[in-house]
From Swiss-Prot:
Transmembrane segments: none annotated. GO terms for cellular component: ribonuclease P complex. Keywords: Endonuclease, Hydrolase, Nuclease, RNA-binding, tRNA processing. Its EC number is 3.1.26.5. This is Ribonuclease P protein component. Consists of a catalytic RNA component (M1 or rnpB) and a protein subunit. The lineage of its organism: Bacteria, Thermotogati, Deinococcota, Deinococci, Deinococcales. It comes from Deinococcus geothermalis (strain DSM 11300 / CIP 105573 / AG-3a). The keyword Iron does not apply. PROSITE patterns: RIBONUCLEASE_P (PS00648). GO terms for biological process: tRNA 5'-leader removal.
């Protein structure tokens, strides 16, 4: 995400999804002014000094979360989000961090609602099957 305006919009209008490892504030995907509609995930990672004192730890937390997001199976749902890691992100094994992200991101398509565009309007919904988990909690595409 770029600029204070986008962060402020997500902070004020976003839905908070909490996990012991992080908090994810998320809103619907809306293209920037003049951009073409290309639904994608735009995620800003914010680590405060209050959460992790040392810059080394803040940077390590950012890198771990960024890599976990990059390597997620099934990709990311289209949204704008702010991810706020907790100190546990540094010590938890990497597969657990990925599993926590999958759990929380699976809730995103159902929790985020687009504003306006009533019946017959210009509403776009998430395509069926866009969540990375099936109804019984398994990753989509696994036996």
């Amino acid at each position: 995400m770029k600029g204070e305006r986008e962060f402020r919009r997500v902070r004020q209008q976003g839905v908070a999804l909490r996990d012991p490892l992080f908090t994810l504030r998320v809103t619907d995907y809306r293209p920037r002014h003049g951009e073409v509609w290309r639904p994608q995930a735009i995620i800003g990672i914010v680590v405060s000094k209050k959460t992790l004192r040392r810059a080394v730890d803040r940077n390590r937390a950012r890198r771990r979360v960024r890599e976990a997001l990059r390597t997620l199976p099934g990709g990311l749902p289209p949204c704008r989000a702010i991810l706020l890691p907790n100190p546990g992100v540094l010590t938890v094994p990497f597969p657990e961090l990925q599993a926590a992200l999958v759990r929380v991101l699976a809730q995103v398509p159902g929790r985020v609602k687009r504003k306006g565009g009533g019946p017959g309007g210009n509403r776009r919904s998430a395509p069926p099957g866009s969540a990375p988990l099936t109804d019984d909690g398994r990753l989509r595409g696994e036996p």
